[in-house]
């Protein structure tokens, strides 16, 4: 699993989509402003990709990230840009971060959450969660990702229980997937539940 180029795929000044509690678009604001203090509710997505062994691809966030640097997180998470469909944004980001394209993503659910990181800033997101499968090589972007690995679900459960170096949204999403979307999850992991 080689590192991809050092292509810059986002900036603090990019315009994110502000939403209300029903995910209706209500405006736009720069990424840096959306993440200040308690954060401003904005649209986001998270992706969970499994290989043919039922192992989840997870990433360690870059040391350059302002929020939760060097924490383990799900396969990919980001924001659609102004005027961009959420599924198009998810596919764009998979290619930009991991060199993955041409796969099918299944929509699971949407939820909102707020989480603060030290006194640096917060996520305050209306997040759509997708699941899918991956076969083939993954080439990650070193500006976005420190490292990647595949992990089986049982090991992930143990690590999340013992270690605090997992992003809060990853923990929330994983719990919801197991508890409320086990039928969909079973298609991808086959053996573990």
Where do the model's predicted regions map?
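Short, Lys/Arg-enriched, disordered terminal segments
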Residues: 1-12, 183-193
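Acidic, metal-coordinating catalytic segment for phosphate/diphosphate chemistry
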Residues: 2-46, 50-52
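Short glycine-enriched loop/turn motifs at secondary-structure junctions
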Residues: 10, 73-74, 140-144
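Nudix hydrolase/Nudix homology domain
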Residues: 33, 82, 109-114, 121-193
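A short, polar/proline- and glycine-enriched secondary-structure boundary/capping micro-motif
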Residues: 37-39, 67-72, 149-152
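A glycine-rich, hydrophobic loop/mini-helix early in the fold
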Residues: 44-77
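The catalytic Nudix box helix
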Residues: 57-58, 75-108, 130
